Amino acid sequence: MTRIRFTAAYDGRPYLGWQSQPGGRTVQDVLERAFSGLFGTTCRIHGSGRTDAGVHALGQVFHADAPDTHRIPADKWPAALNTRLPRTIRITHAEYVPPGFHARFSATGKTYRYCISRAPILNPFDAGLAWHRPLAWSVDILEQAVHLFRGTHDFTAFAALRGNEPRPIPEGYFRRTITQTQVAQTGEHVFITFTGTGFLYKMVRLMTGAAHEAARGKITLEELARLINAPLPDDKSPFCAPPDGLTLMRVHYPEETFGDKKKIN
């Protein structure tokens, strides 16, 4: 078997998220069916992490183990798979990697981008791709609020619970590091970018929702800073942005040089 690392882009609107579920309407399920059809046998893939229903990706990473009988040049893999995939899922990159590489456990961080539309009337082509917030709010305050998340914090207030957390929850379980943040406006769109070493369930959407509440003047920057820097055990931010505007842009890995590697444009 030969291990291959793939990068995938997908429109999350038709799917119930990344992770396989009964019924098969997830990105992972669709990809696994494409691999199994190509290999003639069941194939499991392993992603860098989950994306929720309606969340998009331009840089999701997963790995698969291909039979040695199917070793082809890396730049041939995207075409071989894309012909078996719906137009809402594309393989954009493939490379052979050492057997110890793991899409999830080898990752060192991720970058997410959230899109907000300020248009008075939402462009139909933004439906499901941007959060429509046409009422008055301050991009400057939004930027200040977003930058408060930089650094290492206990993100208790900005994490939803899946129900499968360890009990009791260990100390430091909600601690994460946000290394970079950015807010940029292009026309009627505002883009918020977070890069971090790891993200909790719904963390980006909860951070975005809280920052937007500050931009609307519904909470102060001081109140937001307290939730970030000194959360109480039961603190939970109630402001969760919808999945529509969220895109996984990139999964980060240590600098490595793999063998047969080519960027697919």
From Swiss-Prot:
Homodimer. Gene3D superfamilies: Pseudouridine synthase I, catalytic domain, C-terminal subdomain, Pseudouridine synthase I, catalytic domain, N-terminal subdomain. This is tRNA pseudouridine synthase A. It is an enzyme of class 5 (isomerase). Keywords: Isomerase, tRNA processing. Pfam families: PseudoU_synth_1. CDD domains: PseudoU_synth_EcTruA. Disulfide bonds: none annotated. The active site is at D52 (nucleophile). One of its GO terms (biological process) is tRNA pseudouridine synthesis. GO terms for molecular function: RNA binding; tRNA pseudouridine(38-40) synthase activity. Substrate binds at Y112. Belongs to the tRNA pseudouridine synthase TruA family. Signal peptide: none annotated. Its EC number is 5.4.99.12. HAMAP family: TruA. The keyword tRNA processing applies. Formation of pseudouridine at positions 38, 39 and 40 in the anticodon stem and loop of transfer RNAs. It comes from the Bacteria. It catalyses: uridine(38/39/40) in tRNA = pseudouridine(38/39/40) in tRNA.
